[in-house]
Amino acid sequence: MNHGQLQIPEGIDLVIHSGDATNWADPYRNESEMRAFIDWFATIPIPKKIFVPGNHDTSIDKGLVPRDLIEHRGITLLIDQEIVIDGLKFWGTPWTPRYGNWSWMVDRGTINRKWDGIPDDTDVLICHGPPYGILDATYAQNNKVELVGCSALAKRVTKVEPQLMLFGHVHSTKDIRNAGIRTVSDYRTRFSNASCCDDGKMGVVTSNGNVIEIS
């Protein structure tokens, strides 16, 4: 991923990355990618930065890129943790339903235990993956469209009702557009999928993230 292709707008107070800053599954190959991402992310002239890792970010999971290195660069790393900024409570969690052998993955039957840890008073929920049915459509191997978000996460979001939920993980592909912001009639929450590369075009920015105002 060439993060330098992203255009960071001026005048924003906080930038959030919701994971998959890297590509390699092998943590030893992943390490150099992650360190390059941190170098780039740290130079963004925005006063506050949050990073929630994704399933691709294996070098953090395996301890090759330690928390101290990230936070020493002015980046807040959230792994099932909260930070309060200007009175708003942000909760970051990296887990997604298991698919292959990646980091921070849990079987769908037990992943609700992770979501139970999301505080009821969360204002901004930062996950790596989407809730079921919201900006989570993709093509299955049989070329049929399927929704791959987490139903247990969707259930938890309806209870917590954060103002905003941020995620990535499921990319846009072919004629399906997942990157963007959506409001859903059954939720009081606004949803943002900030995946910046389309499936099949990894390394090429096809979406520049989302800019959202919240108070």
Question: Predicted segments — roles?
Answer:
Residues 26-28, 60-63, 100-102, 134-137, ...:
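Short glycine-/acidic-enriched loop or helix-start segments at secondary-structure transitions
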Residues 2, 22, 57-58, 95-98, ...:
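Short, solvent-exposed loop/turn segments at secondary-structure junctions
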Residues 88-124, 142-155:
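Binuclear metal-dependent hydrolase catalytic cores centered on His/Asp/Glu-rich metal-binding motifs
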Residues 84-86, 155-160, 164, 171-215:
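Binuclear metal-dependent phosphoesterase catalytic core
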Residues 22, 26-33, 121-163:
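Active-site-proximal segments of metal-dependent phosphoesterases and phosphodiesterases across multiple
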Residues 2-85:
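Core catalytic region of metal-dependent phosphoesterases/phosphodiesterases
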Residues 15-20, 48-55, 78-79, 124-128, ...:
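Active-site neighborhood of phospho(di)ester-bond hydrolases with catalytic His/Asp-centered motifs
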Residues 8-10, 41-46, 68-72, 118-119, ...:
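Short, conserved loop/helix-junction motifs that constitute active-site signature segments
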